[in-house]
């Protein structure tokens, strides 16, 4: 039986879109979407070949953002509104490298979820 080839889905790319940067303590994930939220390009520190503690570095975030913005720029994205979520290291360097990649950053919004005293946090590490 012949192997089914994966069909690449068509995403309508407008000149303006959104960049979602999810920065955790372990990894950073960057998604560039159109206004509807359909993903144009995505990248992460793990996808770029970083492993372990190297994934949570500003350099890894920079490399992931460069890779992502290059693909989106070729697709036709020109301006983005950046949504940043999480406490990780590479937030600023990811925004800076999206801007240096040729995509204009119009707005930066922090959407980090803050509990109104919800779940008990994990215990403090003693090293």
Swiss-Prot record:
Record keywords, A-Z: Ribonucleoprotein, Ribosomal protein, RNA-binding, rRNA-binding
GO biological process assignments: translation
One Gene Ontology molecular-function label: structural constituent of ribosome
Protein family membership: Belongs to the universal ribosomal protein uS11 family.
Organism encoding this protein: Flavobacterium johnsoniae (strain ATCC 17061 / DSM 2064 / JCM 8514 / BCRC 14874 / CCUG 350202 / NBRC 14942 / NCIMB 11054 / UW101) (Cytophaga johnsonae)
PROSITE patterns hit by this protein: RIBOSOMAL_S11
GO CC terms of this entry: ribonucleoprotein complex; ribosome
Pfam families listed in its UniProt record: Ribosomal_S11 (PF00411)
Annotated gene: rpsK
Record function comment: Located on the platform of the 30S subunit, it bridges several disparate RNA helices of the 16S rRNA. Forms part of the Shine-Dalgarno cleft in the 70S ribosome.
SUPFAM superfamilies, per database record: Translational machinery components
Subunit description: Part of the 30S ribosomal subunit. Interacts with proteins S7 and S18. Binds to IF-3.
Superkingdom of this protein's organism: Bacteria
Annotated InterPro entries: Ribosomal_uS11, Ribosomal_uS11_bac-type, Ribosomal_uS11_CS, Ribosomal_uS11_sf
Name assigned to this protein: Small ribosomal subunit protein uS11
